Amino acid sequence: KKLSIIFFFFSLLLCNLLAGCGSKDPAPAADHKLRVVVTFNAMKEFTQAVGQDKIHITSLIPDGTEPHDFQPTTKTMQALSKADILIYNSTGMERWVEQATQAAANPKLVIVEASKDTDRISLTEADEIRAHGQYDPHTWLSLSCAQTEVKNIAEALAAADKTNADFYRKNAAEYNQKLQALLAAYQKKFSKLEQKDFVTGHAAFAYLCRDFGLQQQSIEDVFASGEPSAQNLGKLTAYCKEHNVKTIFVEEAVSPKTSE
């Protein structure tokens, strides 16, 4: 129960804090804001924190849509064809990015993989590796990895808009200080807990678990796909009873039916 309360409180804080070629000098004209498209909300929050009023930002994946299930639309292509920069998390998360950017036929589009150089967690299931690549894509859920993503975004904006480069880097540094403070605060809180296991509908929290020494038990796999077998569901039910689990954390974009 204590773990559930602290984890829920942490989730609220994290949501509030995180609420995603051409010429030699690609800097835009003084009256032109960079047109930045991002894939989903975490990328939007990081990018907005860095770019603030110097950029115009558009999200490709609508609110309430499960990012793993998203497929590009005509509207997606239109946004990409007009953008200066695309910021996405990783090829494991947004596997459609390469084909979509090719189809958009925008030779000046700068494509930024925010999770580059993060300390990624390797997948272990052969089926997941074949379908999605070698790594768990949920890097932004680590407050350590998130800081790398913010820095990568800042450097991309600085390269595209040299006039405001210092502005972007300053904002990134200030935002990362907040992330680091949050990381330190919750490492201390979670270190005091005896019960560090929790149950979630979707195995998306390996990075958060690594940050805080937690252990997730999940109903669905890393990519929110497939139905659990009767055997696995039975094991989870028994686990919840044995450990007196009162809460299952389910994402808004994922059906809560199985969790219920």
Please tell me what each predicted stretch does.
Residues N16, G20-E260:
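Extracytoplasmic metal-acquisition and chelation regions
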Residues F7-L17:
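Bacterial N-terminal signal peptides
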Residues K1-L3:
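Positively charged n-region of N-terminal signal peptides that target proteins for export
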